[in-house]
């Protein structure tokens, strides 16, 4: 009997709580909706512009990010760019280390067992983290710089160029203090190093943005299969000629002791 009474009382408390929630729910939801609507009204888009500089096999990837004019607390924030490098390109980790020492860029490779000498068809995608810097010419802007290099591709039968697609990166932001406009852009949270020379892990906000270009396409010159016989013949001829000249020079000018 006592157990039945306790069950009835528990059910009554649950019904009372549900009724209270139904009574207060619409008002709270309306208040939250008004608050979100106010924040959305003052939202401005994040604009990302990604472009590739230079020609040939050695390029520079330049990423510029512009925030809205209404940002007052942007100086408390850091921007991290997570860039995927396609198999047709590679980033030299030793070059990145040299650029960090000279304070030119702050970037680090995430991928391990990375072979910079491998051709395109034996490579896989890699990942780079770039800590963007404030743009001195724009108050609400960040920019990042990354040198990339084209890998060798298989010869083509017709076209003498190969296309490499560089997709837009992920933008991650970490701020020392919260401010309402972050709700406009924050999509999810991602764990990443707080700084380049820091082993601490921070929870970065993955940001939504609008890109000027859908993606960047690089055209890389490649050989033609119709030239295979010619290239092999000339290479073999030059190799034999050079080897012969070296042997002649060794026997003519070399000093041998028995």
Swiss-Prot record:
Residues 252-258 are cytoplasmic. One of its GO terms (cellular component) is endoplasmic reticulum membrane. Coiled coil: none annotated. InterPro entries: PIG-X/PBN1, PIGX. Residues 22-230 are lumenal. It is a single-pass type I membrane protein. It comes from the Eukaryota. Part of the glycosylphosphatidylinositol-mannosyltransferase I complex that is composed of PIGM and PIGX. Interacts with PIGM; PIGX stabilizes PIGM. This is GPI alpha-1,4-mannosyltransferase I, stabilizing subunit. It comes from Homo sapiens.
